């Protein structure tokens, strides 16, 4: 079985999502999202330049990716690209916190779908 990649890799797609995507700010995390015609929902976790410490950044990335993967069922065949910009004050997030937050964000995004 082929592993599905949920990351946005293209610099052009990321820049376009920053320009055209909708915006939510929640507790030190900025979220940009846009509905897409692709057959998969994708995401990327990024940080401002002032966020030092690769170990902490990578831990936050892993937590976000795993929680996002588990919450994909809530999207119900609607496909959305997300960018999560995490600021340094949110470096000590735990799995349960991120899981609950992502669930609420996805429900909010689905309600805003036209």
From Swiss-Prot:
It is an enzyme of class 3 (hydrolase). Transmembrane segments: none annotated. Gene3D superfamilies: 3.30.230.10. InterPro entries: Ribosomal_Su5_D2-typ_SF, Ribsml_uS5_D2-typ_fold_subgr, RNase_P. One of its GO terms (biological process) is tRNA 5'-leader removal. Consists of a catalytic RNA component (M1 or rnpB) and a protein subunit. This is Ribonuclease P protein component.
